[in-house]
Amino acid sequence: MKYFFASDIHGSSFYTKKYKESNASKLVLLGDLLYHGPRNDLPKDYCPKEVFAMLNECKDDIIAVRGNCDSEVDQMVLDFPMQSDYCIGVFNDIYFFITHGHIYGEDHLPQLAKGSAFIYGHVHLPIAKKSGDIYILNPGSASLPKEQNPNSYAILDDDIFTIYDFDGNVLKEIKLEKNI
């Protein structure tokens, strides 16, 4: 199964459209979906109404967690749950701890089993690495990247986690082994 991971859309309709083009089976949203937050500039094509309409069209394919810019008001317009701070899923036989990153992060990991993947957003940086027995993954920011990185998203296809820019260039890639 093919999974599309996106974080920190921040209301950008331009970057939300990429999921439909990907032919992925599931869309995993790592928070900060609609609002840009008081510290960020407006992202390209900022239109939260268009974003929630597009996301609601594929609500049955979405797994989502809450980001620090997401609110109860956002949940009122979304037809899928996104108020949990984290969720645990199994994708292609690998355990994933999915969170935004404002509570748990690379420097504050939850207890994870050997071979698990910790995937988060929040820092707006693309990351794909192994740290000890845990995979640390971050698709980067779809709309407001930091440190001169391009706008990005990730695809998990079989056991390969690949981070792409929106021109289709591979930024980072890692093979996830089931039992490290």
Put a short name on every predicted segment.
Residues 39-41, 74-78, 84, 108-109, ...:
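Short, well-ordered secondary-structure micro-motifs
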Residues 26, 96, 116-117:
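Short, Asp-centered acidic motifs that coordinate Mg2+ and/or phosphate
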